[in-house]
C-alpha cells in the first residue's frame, strides 16, 4: 500500500472536472414573455475506458442530468476559466473552449445515479493525452471498516483536490430528495464537497472503489 501522496500522484491523471450548462425558462409575469437563462454547475468524473475515437468517463447522473452543454477539464487545465468559457459558449456543437474539451452523454442510469460521457480523442491536445490515463478499477466487495481511503474531485469547482480519511461504515442506505432510497453505500469521513460528485474514492493501492 502507498502513501496518500503516492496514490494522488498516480491517480490524478485519471480524474477530470466536468462543467455543465443547462437552460432554464423563467415564466412570464404581467403579460411579459418568458425568459431563458443559463445556469452552470460543476462535478467530477473518472476516465474508465476508451475506444478508437473516444475516452469514456464515468460520473454521477445528477452531474449531467438536464445539461445542454458539457465540457471536461483534464489534469493541469484551468477549471475556473473553463467554466466561464463554457457558460459563454453556445451549445455543444459550437463549443470552442481553450481550457476544456467538449463532451457528450453516452448513457445514463438514473436509478443508480450513474452516467458515462465521452470525449473525442481528436479534441484533446497531444500533451494532455500523454498525461492522462485510465483508472485502475478495484473492488468494493473487499473493503473493511477502518480502511484508509483517498478522495479526488473537483471540490467547489476549483479543480482537483485531494482529501483522505477512513471507511466509517459499509452498506449504508440513505433517502434522497426525491424520496427514493440508495443502498449499499460507502460512508467515509474523507472531506467531500460540492463538485466532488462523480469523482474518485480510492484504496491505498490507487484502485477505484467508489
Where are the language model's segments positioned?
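Serine-dependent protease modules
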Residues: 1-210
Amino acid at each position: 500500500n502507498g502513501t496518500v501522496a503516492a496514490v494522488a500522484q498516480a491517480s490524478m491523471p485519471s480524474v477530470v472536472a466536468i462543467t455543465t450548462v443547462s437552460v432554464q425558462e423563467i415564466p412570464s409575469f404581467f403579460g411579459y414573455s418568458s425568459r431563458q437563462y443559463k445556469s452552470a454547475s460543476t462535478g467530477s468524473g473518472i476516465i474508465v475506458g476508451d475506444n478508437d475515437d473516444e475516452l469514456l468517463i464515468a460520473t454521477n447522473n445528477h452531474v449531467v442530468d438536464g445539461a445542454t452543454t458539457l465540457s471536461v477539464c483534464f489534469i493541469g487545465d484551468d477549471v475556473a476559466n473553463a467554466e466561464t468559457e463554457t457558460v459563454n459558449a453556445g451549445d455543444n456543437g459550437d463549443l470552442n473552449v481553450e481550457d476544456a474539451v467538449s463532451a457528450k452523454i453516452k448513457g445514463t442510469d438514473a436509478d443508480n445515479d450513474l452516467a458515462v460521457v465521452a470525449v473525442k480523442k481528436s479534441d484533446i491536445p497531444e500533451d494532455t493525452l500523454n498525461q492522462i490515463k485510465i483508472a485502475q478499477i478495484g473492488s468494493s466487495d473487499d473493503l473493511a471498516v477502518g480502511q484508509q481511503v483517498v478522495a479526488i474531485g473537483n471540490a467547489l469547482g476549483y479543480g482537483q483536490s485531494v482529501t483522505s480519511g477512513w471507511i466509517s461504515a459499509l452498506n449504508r442506505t440513505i433517502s434522497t430528495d426525491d424520496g427514493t432510497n440508495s443502498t449499499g453505500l460507502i460512508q467515509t469521513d474523507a472531506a467531500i464537497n460540492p463538485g466532488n460528485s462523480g469523482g474518485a474514492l480510492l484504496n491505498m493501492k490507487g484502485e477505484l472503489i467508489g
